[in-house]
Swiss-Prot record:
UniProt gene name: pcm
The keyword NADP is annotated on this UniProt entry: no
Gene Ontology cellular component list: cytoplasm
Protein name listed in UniProt: Protein-L-isoaspartate O-methyltransferase
Known function: Catalyzes the methyl esterification of L-isoaspartyl residues in peptides and proteins that result from spontaneous decomposition of normal L-aspartyl and L-asparaginyl residues. It plays a role in the repair and/or degradation of damaged proteins.
Family of the protein in this entry: Belongs to the methyltransferase superfamily. L-isoaspartyl/D-aspartyl protein methyltransferase family.
Catalytic activity: [protein]-L-isoaspartate + S-adenosyl-L-methionine = [protein]-L-isoaspartate alpha-methyl ester + S-adenosyl-L-homocysteine
Protein's organism: Shewanella woodyi (strain ATCC 51908 / MS32)
């Protein structure tokens, strides 16, 4: 990163700490990650603002606070193998890949997946597996997973994702239509407990693939 970007990323991490993010590893990952890399050049000047921004195809790069909060919730379970549903710009994947030994990420929009792969390669992150496909189905051949993060809002919690969690594994997912709740779902054998974390707003999790 340039000196200006490095300072901006550090300031963003500080603002997230002030907003309540406590995990120092998460804050360090935010400080280390050039968010402008995941945006069109025209939006580069907004890269370190704590706001969601458009990335094309009706999708967004999530607000940094939400990226950090969801990551913090996931890391409480010390996962070694993580599944991300909705690669999008690749920014959330960049944060996760710095904090877990193995990341698998699924994206249904081919053009976004191609761009994300190129960006993450530039960051020299090599512990990521990519899949172009329907996020509702997860990635059964790669599972089970210690943790799953969904970066789009589902109308209901997808059964396929629950089935791909290990025992004591955690699913972090926004659920709802116009009114959405961020849920933390934990597997206990064949049972699941669910906790509402906070109110959020995400683009919808859509079935199928889009070239």
């Amino acid at each position: 990163m340039s000196r200006v970007a490095t300072t901006a990323a550090l300031n963003l991490a500080k603002s997230l700490r002030d907003a309540g993010i406590r995990d120092e590893a998460v804050l360090q990952a935010v400080a280390n990650t050039p968010r402008e890399l995941f945006l069109d050049a025209a939006l580069g000047h907004k890269a370190y603002e704590n706001t969601a921004l458009p990335i094309g195809m009706g999708q967004t790069i999530s607000q940094p606070y939400i990226v950090a909060r969801m990551t913090e919730l996931l890391l409480e379970h010390k996962p070694k193998k993580v599944l991300e549903i909705g690669t999008g710009s690749g920014y959330q994947a960049a944060i996760l890949a710095q904090l877990s030994p193995e990341l698998c990420t699924v994206e249904r929009i081919k053009s976004l997946q191609i761009q994300a792969r190129q960006r993450l390669k530039r960051l020299d992150l090599h512990n990521i597996s990519f899949k172009y496909g329907d996020g509702w189905k997860g990635w059964p051949n790669k599972g089970p997973f210690d943790a799953i993060m969904v970066t789009a809002a589902a109308a209901t919690v997808p059964e396929a994702l629950l089935g791909q969690l290990v025992d004591n594994g955690v699913l972090i997912i926004p659920v709802g239509d116009t009114s959405q709740q961020l849920l933390k779902v934990v597997r206990h054998g064949e049972q699941f407990s669910s906790e509402v974390v906070e109110i959020v707003r995400f683009v919808p999790l859509v079935n199928g693939e889009l070239a």
